[in-house]
Amino acid sequence: PTAILAMNQYGGQEVLGKIGADATGLPFNSIMAILLENDHPSTPLVNAGAISACSMIKPVGDSDGKWKAIVSFIADLAGSDVAVIDELYKSETATNFNNKSIAWLLKNYNRIYDDPDMALDIYTRQCSIGVTARQLATMAATIANSGVNPVTGKAVFKPELTPKIASMMATVGFYEHTGDWLFTTGLPAKTGVGGGIMGVVPGVMGVAAFAPPLDGAGNSVKAQKALAFIAGHLNLNVFGTTRCVMAGKEPVKA
C-alpha cells in the first residue's frame, strides 16, 4: 500500500526514478540486490524499495504525520479500520537488523529520502498491521476498480495508477518465484510473508487468500493453490483472449 500512496503523492514516474520497478530475482530481503542494481532499490515490492517508499511519504520529516497518512490510506483501501499488532511490531523491531542494514545502505547511496531510522520504523509498523482476508480482497478490488473502493464508493487513488500497480505485481509480486507464478496463472498478484496473497484483474475483480505456511521464497503454499484454481476456473489470465465478465454484471467484486 505504501508504494501506491507514494505514487499517488508524487506520480508514477517520480517513484520509478527514485526507486525503480525491476525484479531482482533474489529474496525479498536481499542486500546483494541493492549492490547488483547499481545502488538502486529496484522495486517498492521488496524490502529495500518499500523502506525507500516509506521515506518518501509526505509529510517528509514528520513521523506522526507519515504514519497517519499511511494508516488512513490502508483503511481507505480496505474499506474499514486497520490496526497494528503490537506484539508483532515489538518482535520485528527487536530483530530487524537486516532491514536496518538495508536502510543505511540506501542512505549511503542517496536512495532514502528522509531519516533512515524513521523510515525503517514506519516500514516495520506498516508490516505489523493486521488485516482480514476480506479486507485484503477489498484492497485488491479497489486496485482493480481504478482506485475506487467498490464497497465504500470512495476514490482512494488516481485511476491512472492501476495499470502501473498491476504491472509491478505481475513482474515482482511473488519475489524470485514471480516468473513461475505468472507463467502458470497469468494473474498479477502480490504475496506477503504474513501468508496473504492478493490478485488483481484490472476492470474485472480483486481476489485474496490467506494461509500461514510459506514456501522457501516467503509465499503462502495454500493461498497460491487457491488463487491458481480460481484464476483457472474463472479464466483470469490477463494475457488470455477470454474473460469471465458477462455483459450487465458488476465489473469488480471483492
Segments predicted by a language model, with ranges:
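Alpha-helix initiation and N-capping motif
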Residues: 50, 67, 71, 99, ...
